[in-house]
C-alpha cells in the first residue's frame, strides 16, 4: 500500500541517500555508552569547569536529539538529558558530515570530554559523532508537545519521548509493583503463577472474554480473577501465596476501568477478614512510606493517608443515609423500599442485591478518605464465609478511596457443602439474567472437600493503586498500551 509522506519525511529519507554517498550509515551497529546522564550529573555536577578540564574525562554518551541550537545539541537518554558541544572545526570529516545531516529525533553516539558551559551546566565536548538511528518521522515540536490525551495513548512511544511526566509515571509503576513484592516477600508469602485460560468462569462477578481452545475442542475463558486456583494452593499446604498478573473482564471502559488490568490477590491460611484488612492496609502503608507520600489528589479529592483506615458497616452506612434500619426489613419490604428509591429490579434480585444497589446509590459517593466497608450480603458474596451473627451477611469488606473501590477481601468460605449451594444459587441467577454470575467449579469444590484451613484473602487493583500514588486521572495514563477505538 502506497503511503503519503509529509515534506519532512521526504527530506529525512533523502538524507539517508546523502549519508550513504558519504559512506555513512543511517542505521548503525550499536556502540556501548560508558555513562548515562544520571551518573554524570550525580558524580560531576559540583566540580568546576577548571577541575573537569584538568581531569580530561572522556565518555561515550548515547541519546536522542531533543534540541539543536547552533553547535549545541541536547541528547536525551533513559535517565535525563545531556548537552553536547560540537565544534565543526575540531570534528573529523565523518563526524562533521553526520552533524550537518542530523535532525531532531535522531539517535547519536557521542565520544568526548566532560566540561561545563558558561552557565555552569555539564557539557560533553564532542570529538566523534556517530549516527546510530535516523528518525524518519519528525517529533512534535517541543513547545506544543504531544498534548492530546488520545494521541498520547495511541502513540505511547512518542509520549514517552516527549513527556517527562509520562516517563516518571511508568518508572514509578515499576517501583510500586516492586514495593508490593517487597512487602509480601518480607512476610514469607510466595509468588505463584496460575492459568490465564480457564475452562470454568469463576472467582468474581464479571463478564468474560471467551476464546476457543483448538487442541481441547472447547471454549475457554480468559481469567476474571485468580481466586479459585490460589485457594486450591492453600488447600495444598502453601499457607501464604500471592499472584500479580493480568485479569480480563469484557466490560466497559472509563477513567478507572480497563478490560485488561493488573491485580494482586493474596491468601493467608489461619487469617480472616480482620487480618486481611491489616494486610491490605499494610500494603498502602509500606508504599506510602517507601515513596514518602503525604497526600495525593485523586478523582478530584485531596486524600490524606491516616492509619488505621476508617471502618464502617455497610448496613449501618445505608441505614444512616436513607433513615431506615434495613436490618429489620424482610425481603418483601426491601423490594418496596427499592421501588420507593427508584431502583430498577432485575429478575434475579433478592434481598442482598437491593442492599448493594442502595449502597452504590447513596453511600459510595461519600467515601472520600480511605475506608473499609464491611458486612456485605450473601447474595453478592458467593465465595465469602457467612457472618455467624447474621447469616444474611458475610465476612467481607471493600476498601474505598476517593469514592472508588481499591480492594476486596474476606474470610474465605471453606465449607464445601455451603460453597456448592452458593454455586448452584449462582446458576439460578444466571438463568434469570445475571450475566456476571459464576459457574460451578467442581474441581474447586473437590479441593475444598479435602479441607481448606480457615483463610483470609484479598485483591487489590494495581492500576488504580498506581493512579492514586502517581496522581493520574485516568487508568489509561498508567497502562502503557491501553486498548482504544480504531481510528476512522
From Swiss-Prot:
GO function terms (MF aspect): ATP binding; lysine-tRNA ligase activity; magnesium ion binding; tRNA binding
Pfam assignment, any one: tRNA_anti-codon
Keyword field contains Protein biosynthesis: yes
Binding site for Mg(2+) 1: 398, 405
Keyword Ligase included in the entry's annotation: yes
Subcellular location per the Swiss-Prot or TrEMBL entry: Cytoplasm
UniProt cross-references to InterPro entries, sorted A to Z: Aa-tRNA-synt_II (IPR004364), aa-tRNA-synth_II (IPR006195), aa-tRNA-synth_II/BPL/LPL (IPR045864), Lys-tRNA-ligase_II (IPR002313), Lys-tRNA-ligase_II_N (IPR044136), Lys-tRNA-synth_II_C (IPR018149), NA-bd_OB-fold (IPR012340), NA-bd_OB_tRNA (IPR004365)
Cofactor(s), by name: Mg(2+)
Record: residues binding Mg(2+) 2: 405
CDD domains (alphabetical): LysRS_core, LysRS_N
Catalytic activity entry: tRNA(Lys) + L-lysine + ATP = L-lysyl-tRNA(Lys) + AMP + diphosphate
UniProt GO cellular component terms: cytosol
Cofactor note: Binds 3 Mg(2+) ions per subunit.
Enzyme type, top EC level: ligase
EC identifiers of the protein: 6.1.1.6
Keywords: Aminoacyl-tRNA synthetase, ATP-binding, Cytoplasm, Ligase, Magnesium, Metal-binding, Nucleotide-binding, Protein biosynthesis
Any Gene Ontology biological process: lysyl-tRNA aminoacylation
Quaternary structure annotation from Swiss-Prot or TrEMBL: Homodimer.
Family of this protein: Belongs to the class-II aminoacyl-tRNA synthetase family.
PANTHER family membership: LYSINE--TRNA LIGASE, CHLOROPLASTIC_MITOCHONDRIAL, LYSYL-TRNA SYNTHETASE
NCBIfam families, per the entry: lysS_bact, PRK00484.1
Protein name: Lysine--tRNA ligase
Provenance organism: Metamycoplasma hominis (strain ATCC 23114 / DSM 25592 / NBRC 14850 / NCTC 10111 / PG21)
Name of the encoding gene: lysS
Amino acid at each position: 500500500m502506497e503511503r503519503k509522506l509529509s515534506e519532512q519525511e521526504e527530506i529525512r529519507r533523502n538524507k539517508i541517500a546523502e549519508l550513504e554517498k558519504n559512506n555513512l550509515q543511517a542505521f548503525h551497529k550499536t556502540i556501548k555508552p560508558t555513562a548515562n546522564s544520571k551518573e554524570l550529573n550525580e558524580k560531576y555536577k559540583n566540580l568546576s569547569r577548571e577541575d573537569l578540564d584538568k581531569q580530561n574525562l572522556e565518555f561515550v554518551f548515547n541519546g536522542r536529539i531533543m534540541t539543536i541550537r547552533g553547535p549545541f545539541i541536547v541528547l536525551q537518554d533513559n535517565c535525563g538529558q545531556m548537552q553536547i558541544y560540537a565544534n565543526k572545526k575540531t570534528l573529523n570529516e565523518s563526524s562533521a558530515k553526520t552533524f550537518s545531516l542530523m535532525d531532531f529525533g535522531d539517535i547519536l553516539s557521542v565520544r568526548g570530554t566532560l566540561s561545563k558551559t558558561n552557565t555552569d551546566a555539564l557539557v560533553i565536548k564532542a570529538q566523534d559523532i556517530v549516527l546510530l538511528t535516523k528518525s524518519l518521522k519528525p517529533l512534535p515540536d517541543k513547545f506544543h508537545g504531544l498534548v492530546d490525551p488520545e494521541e498520547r495513548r495511541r502513540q505511547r512511544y512518542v509520549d514517552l519521548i516527549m513527556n517527562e511526566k509520562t516517563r516518571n509515571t511508568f518508572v514509578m509503576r515499576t517501583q510500586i509493583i516492586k514495593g508490593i513484592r517487597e512487602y509480601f516477600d518480607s512476610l514469607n508469602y510466595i509468588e505463584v503463577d496460575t492459568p490465564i485460560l480457564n475452562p470454568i468462569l469463576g472467582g468474581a462477578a464479571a463478564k468474560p472474554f471467551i476464546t476457543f481452545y483448538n487442541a481441547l475442542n472447547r471454549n475457554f475463558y480468559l481469567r476474571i480473577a485468580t481466586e479459585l486456583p490460589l485457594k486450591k494452593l492453600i488447600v495444598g499446604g502453601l499457607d501464604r501465596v500471592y499472584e500479580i498478573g493480568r485479569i480480563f473482564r469484557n466490560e466497559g471502559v472509563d477513567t478507572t476501568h480497563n478490560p485488561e488490568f493488573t491485580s494482586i490477590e493474596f491468601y493467608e491460611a489461619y487469617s480472616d477478614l480482620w487480618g486481611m484488612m491489616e494486610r491490605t492496609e499494610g500494603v498502602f502503608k509500606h508504599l506510602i512510606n517507601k515513596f514518602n507520600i503525604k497526600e495525593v489528589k485523586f478523582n478530584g479529592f485531596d486524600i490524606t493517608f491516616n492509619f488505621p483506615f476508617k471502618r464502617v458497616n455497610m448496613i449501618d452506612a445505608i441505614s444512616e443515609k436513607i433513615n431506615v434500619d434495613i436490618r429489620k426489613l424482610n425481603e418483601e419490604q426491601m423490594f418496596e423500599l427499592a421501588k420507593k428509591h427508584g431502583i430498577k429490579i432485575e429478575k434475579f434480585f433478592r434481598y442482598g442485591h437491593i442492599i448493594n444497589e442502595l449502597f452504590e446509590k447513596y453511600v459510595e459517593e461519600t467515601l472520600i478518605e480511605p475506608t473499609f466497608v464491611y458486612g456485605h450480603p450473601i447474595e453478592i458474596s458467593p465465595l465469602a464465609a457467612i457472618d455467624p451473627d447474621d447469616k444474611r451477611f458475610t465476612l467481607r469488606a471493600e476498601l474505598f478511596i476517593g469514592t472508588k473501590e481499591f480492594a476486596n477481601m474476606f474470610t474465605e468460605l471453606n465449607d464445601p457443602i455451603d460453597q456448592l449451594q452458593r454455586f448452584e444459587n449462582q446458576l439460578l441467577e444466571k438463568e434469570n439474567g445475571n450475566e456476571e454470575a459464576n459457574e460451578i467449579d467442581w474441581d474447586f469444590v473437590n479441593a475444598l472437600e479435602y479441607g481448606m484451613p480457615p483463610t483470609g484473602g484479598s485483591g487489590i487493583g494495581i492500576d488504580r493503586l498506581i493512579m492514586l500514588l502517581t496522581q493520574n486521572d485516568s487508568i489509561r495514563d498508567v497502562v502503557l498500551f491501553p486498548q482504544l477505538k480504531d481510528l476512522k
